[in-house]
Amino acid sequence: MRPIPRTMSTQHPDNATVPEWAKGDVIEGEAEVIEAYYAFSRLNVHEVMWDAEGKDVDTHVVRKLFSSFDEYFKNNILGEDIFLTYRLPNPKIEGAERKVFAETMESIPITFDVAERFYGRKVVPVFEVILPFTTNASDIISVARYYERAVAMEENIELQDGVYVRDLVGEIYPKRIEVIPLIEDKDSLLNTRNIIEGYYRAIKPSYMRLFIARSDPAMNYGMLTAVLLAKYALSEAGKLAEELGIPIFPIIGVGSLPFRGHLSPENYQRVMEEYEGVYTFTIQSAFKYDYSEEQVKGAISHINREEVKEPRILGEEEKKVTRDIIETYTLSYQPVIESLANLINTVALHLPRRRARKLHISLFGYARSTGKVMLPRAITFVGSLYSVGLPPEVIGISSLGKLNEMQWNILEENYKFLKNDLQKASEFINPEGLSTLVSYGYLDAEISKKLEEDIKYLESMGVKIGPRSYETKKHALLSQLLMLSLKEKKYNEVKQYAREMAVIRKSIG
């Protein structure tokens, strides 16, 4: 059995601070190749996700890593000791990226040829791909079959009498790849069992990896819903692994701020305890670059060494109650977000850009959708709300007042660190923010009342509201200045204040 990585470095653009080796504010091109090497060699991350979704991808990354850092990769075998995993565009959803999907798949045999020359033996450096927006088993079965039949088996095509493709390009390896479903929407996360089981029945892998989204579900349905969906999916995967008799290794996509998962060098131990059953944690850019390298390395080393706990398996009654809580919370959260969409999209334009990303216009492309409105990517969504002193963790929380005692007990058992996450976020509430937004015309008075109810409910839970430290007090003042600058159309100042606040938070969003 190949080693399964405990940590996966990603290219999420949530870092407020730019690393020293980046040549500008945006990490792109050759800098991302350097970043992959840095993650492996300096931070001791086990796996790097190479993102072909929503941006120009460099399919020659393996060749560049070997040629630039040959000594390191001679001693650390790519595909055996450390791992590079492609994140594909989903060809069913991102129509303009279909050929990028094909190009990325076609590059996998090239990486094999490069590695064979480099190591002097057959080494498969890339053999797993991640498919975003997976909604059913057919999605991932199609990707696995596409590689087998349209890439690996093209060597058998006869070009003319007795002349085959393999005579021109050589034999194609690997013959098959593993596909990791990245499950991002509520219905699909609740349907995790059928997605995994359908793939297993069709492909018969010896093990499976499952990628549970944490950011997009939070943006679309609220933080509490996202946590419960993750727990539900982990339970279903754990139960199915026992039934099928194959190991299933879940990955969770977590960022530094509570809304996006709260995995930071300061809070990683709680996150590992929260998400029992998770094998691989994403190490996103804010984790890597907004803390000291020593702190980052220490946290990653601890995650790499920590024993994996068994997932908590939910009983049928617990599953039903969890679904009920999810519906209650989501119904309270979504209407507020729809009302805030214009404000969020306006502020999002002025947040720092850290990666080269092609914005897509389609409903389920990179402009993400919740209900009836368009929203930016999750990172800028979160950053926008923090920048006006309204952390999204707060939104909809008063709906918990509708829960009975049994529902509360199940919630507390399945979201251990709810109060801790809310307390961290609540320090960034600007107590004057709501009245400022209403007076400037950015917030409807009715929605302001709903948000005030959420804040009062937090206080009833024993959560302290508003800034207490020098840094969080400074953050509140900067959010006031940002709102004033926005009103006066002084956009350079808006950008400056947004950047300063992101540095204080140690994450854009």
From Swiss-Prot:
Cofactor dependency: Mg(2+)
UniProt cross-references to Pfam families, sorted A to Z: PEPcase_2 (PF14010)
InterPro entries per record: PEP_COase_arc-type, Pyrv/PenolPyrv_kinase-like_dom
Keyword terms of this UniProt record: Carbon dioxide fixation, Lyase, Magnesium
Cysteines joined through disulfide linkages: none
SUPFAM superfamilies attached to this UniProt entry: Phosphoenolpyruvate/pyruvate domain
Reactions that this protein is recorded to catalyse: oxaloacetate + phosphate = phosphoenolpyruvate + hydrogencarbonate
HAMAP family: PEPcase_type2 (MF_01904)
Stated role: Catalyzes the irreversible beta-carboxylation of phosphoenolpyruvate (PEP) to form oxaloacetate (OAA), a four-carbon dicarboxylic acid source for the tricarboxylic acid cycle.
Homology family: Belongs to the PEPCase type 2 family.
Name used for this protein in its record: Phosphoenolpyruvate carboxylase
Origin species: Metallosphaera sedula (strain ATCC 51363 / DSM 5348 / JCM 9185 / NBRC 15509 / TH2)
Gene label: ppcA
